[in-house]
Amino acid sequence: HGGQKAPLIIRTRGHRLEGIWHAGSPMGMLINALRGVNILVPRNMTKAAGFYNTMLESDDPGLIIECLNGYRLKEKMPSNLGDFRTPVGVVETTKYGSDVTLVTYGSTWRIVMEAANELEAEGISAEVIDVQSLIPFDVNHKIVESISKTNRVIFIDEDVPGGATAYMMQKVVEEQKDEDRRGKKIR
């Protein structure tokens, strides 16, 4: 935000690490090493296309990490693919609930949605939030609003301990608010 323009889009794939790489993830390193670069983690190729359209109009650099299983999924292509935008820094609530907030991104979103549906069958109402963008992170503080409603949160990803999950928790608990709007402590 210092006024310098750096319109650059870096496209790569990630998530769902396999083989000898299954125990490693670069997300923790990326979010700590690339400050000033938008780090975007779409859950599917439609969302990725929206990020590309958004970043093509931006003067800021962006790293778009496409999920590997997104290449294999059949998706309904939007009729406005060239105009479709995915906003940077804005989370998307993909399932509303009242008992627990599940926060995730990228390829784990499908797994979390399946788990939320299984929880619902057991009488537990889970709200699912797709972060979509690690940097910037939840600029509208929607995760805190959800936690205020459910009083419980679980952060889910495939990163190593201390990586993106720790980053998301720190962003929500320390930087966004340690109290919700009702003055109740968020733990």
Task: Name these PLM-found stretches.
Residues 3-6, 68-187:
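Thiamine diphosphate
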Residues 1-101, 110, 126:
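Conserved thiamine diphosphate
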